[in-house]
Amino acid sequence: MTNPAVTLEMFLRGKLGIAQGPIALHEPWITGNAWAYVKDCLDTAWVSTGGAYVTRLESMCADICNVAFAVATVNGTTALRAALQGLGVGPGDTVLCPALTFVATANAIVHTGAVPLFVDSELGTLGMDPEAVSDVLSSRCNFADGVLRHAATGLRVAAVVPMHVFGNPVDMDRLLEVCAAYDLPIVEDAAEALGSRYKGFPCGGLAKAGILSFNGNKIVTTGGGGMILTNDAELAHRVRHLTTTARVGKGWTFDHDQVGYNDRMPNLNAALGCAQLEELPRFLALKRNLAQQYADLFGSIFVRGSNAGESNAWLNALLLNDATERDSFLEDTNAKGIQTRPAWRLISDLPMYATAPRSGSLAVARDLVERIVNIPSSAQLLAGL
């Protein structure tokens, strides 16, 4: 086919008519009731933690993700850390997570005092490979006094954290099956997957717990924010308590029963989030339309994900031949004002995680990270804005 960089430029500058100016990778679209809701916060001075918009945002997320409980936090990293802590993860534990993910996944594990154990990826989904998880648990872990431990480190295996990469759902059925055999809880890192569905069910609500991110570059933003999702009432209570300074006093008393965190989302941010969630169906329709046009345009090098999943098309991706072609593509597109990016570095290659345990060579993840590029994916691209 034609040089992918040229093909992308012709599509964006030609077909979509974006003749001048930079084209962002993914930018927020502030529309709908955003100004009215934020102004309401300013007019009433309900700008900090607490407030009707926080409660409303939690309710909206619970409905969208088909869970009973949602707890708002200040960002996705704190949401993941709190969800893990709510499940009892802490020092002396290890948590399985993909090597191909954003660094916050591993950082949140470390913030609990636990150690990440990096697992390989699956080519079809880009996410955690359930068979790699099964292999780690069966061949590199054993039960000692009824506790599942990683043999090489002696750490208790406490949880598994898959991440839905770029909004593409992981093979959750197989992963749930593998983890159920070892009674291991799963916390979905759905930071990039609001609106994605796996076999018709919303991502973030498929396991013991899930988390969302509302960073400025996500499909829906609060400026900065996160959400913990669960159907477990006790877990919801624990994480809400933990993220609100563990306060037990009422009224004017200030009693606290453990070392808690001030992870509360401000009402001002939640107001923006409520307006954004009202627009989610439109955002999804436009982004999926764009993804289909990219798929038709790029053919076999476009990353489609699994047939079992319906991505929110947060960040569209191409899978090029090798690192040389990737770097050439990135240089050519960015030089012409079209923002593209590679995937992250493998987290296991970062200096602070160089000695962390892993499932093996991470061959698939390493191959993917050398070939993936993300291309402009904003919903506005098809809205004439």
Give short role names for the model-derived ranges:
Residues R81-L137, V161:
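Conserved PLP-anchoring active-site segment centered on the Schiff-base-forming lysine
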Residues M1-V47, I375-P376:
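N-terminal "arm"/small-domain region of PLP-dependent enzymes with the aminotransferase-like
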Residues V47-T94, A108-V110, F118-D120, N142-A152, ...:
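Phosphate-binding glycine-rich loop
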Residues T112, A181-Y182, K336:
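Helix C-cap/helix->beta junction micro-motif
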Residues G124-T222, M227-L229, E234, N374:
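Active-site phosphate-binding strand-loop segment of PLP-dependent enzymes
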Residues F11, T55-S59, V67-A68, D120, ...:
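PLP-dependent aminotransferase class I/II
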